[in-house]
């Protein structure tokens, strides 16, 4: 009977699991492909069959979380853009913000290990600046929404620096939450209060 093939999906999954442990223990910089292969019981050749390099492997470890987060943000951003383009800038449905936040919180805690890898163990990898890239993505969207609302309320456009700071505040809220709160239900309560705070600040700037 032929021996088990090393180039199968089970081997890939096992490598990802072992890599996750190695990255959690040592961070991206300290982790070694040799150590990961030893834990997985495979050769480095088997690892390179699935992954180009250590960065590719790290991205694979955190990939599911990042894909889900991007999809939630894409759906929420699309909803808000449709609101603005349909002349409902003054009628924004705040409940959509709370729904999106609940989805984000659930994903952050479903993949909390992976989230913490990106936030605290990613130095030296292509994921190192992911929080900054999320701020940039949020910033572009917020600038569009803010301009539409300011026009609807006939008030001057909020300064770009302020919009950028608000974008940082939104991302920083989640970073603080996931790095300081262990329980998902407690995190959701925190996030809901955070959204109330952020919405109050937003409307305080654009409503006359």
Feature annotation, model-predicted:
Residues 1-8:
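N-terminal intrinsically disordered/low-complexity leader segments
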Residues 14, 18, 22-56, 60:
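Helix-turn-helix
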Residues 20, 118-135, 189-201:
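C-terminal/domain-terminus segments
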Residues 61-97:
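Amphipathic alpha-helical linker/stalk segments
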Residues 84-88, 102-125, 176:
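Amphipathic alpha-helical segments used for helix-helix packing
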Residues 100-110, 123-150, 161-168:
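Amphipathic alpha-helical packing segments from all-alpha helical-bundle domains
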Residues 116-120, 146-197, 206-207:
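Hydrophobic/aromatic-rich alpha-helical bundle segments in the mid-to-C-terminal region
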């Amino acid at each position: 009977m032929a021996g088990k093939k090393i180039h199968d999906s089970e081997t890939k999954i096992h490598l990802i699991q072992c890599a996750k442990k190695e990255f959690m223990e040592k961070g991206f910089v300290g982790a070694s492909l040799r150590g990961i292969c030893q834990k997985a019981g495979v050769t480095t050749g088997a690892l390179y069959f699935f992954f180009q390099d250590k960065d590719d492997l790290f991205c694979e470890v955190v990939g599911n979380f990042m894909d889900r987060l991007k999809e939630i943000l894409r759906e929420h951003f699309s909803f808000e853009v449709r609101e603005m383009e349909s002349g409902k800038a003054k009628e924004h449905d705040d409940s959509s913000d709370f729904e999106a936040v609940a989805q984000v919180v659930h994903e952050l805690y479903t993949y909390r290990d992976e989230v913490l890898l990106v936030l605290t163990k990613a130095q030296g990898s292509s994921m190192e600046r992911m929080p900054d890239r999320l701020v940039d993505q949020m910033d572009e969207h917020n600038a569009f929404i803010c301009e539409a609302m300011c026009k609807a309320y006939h008030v001057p456009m909020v300064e770009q620096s302020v919009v950028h700071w608000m974008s940082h505040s939104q991302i920083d809220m989640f970073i603080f939450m996931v790095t300081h709160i262990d329980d998902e239900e407690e995190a959701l309560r925190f996030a809901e209060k955070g959204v109330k705070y952020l919405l109050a600040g937003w409307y305080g700037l654009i409503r006359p």
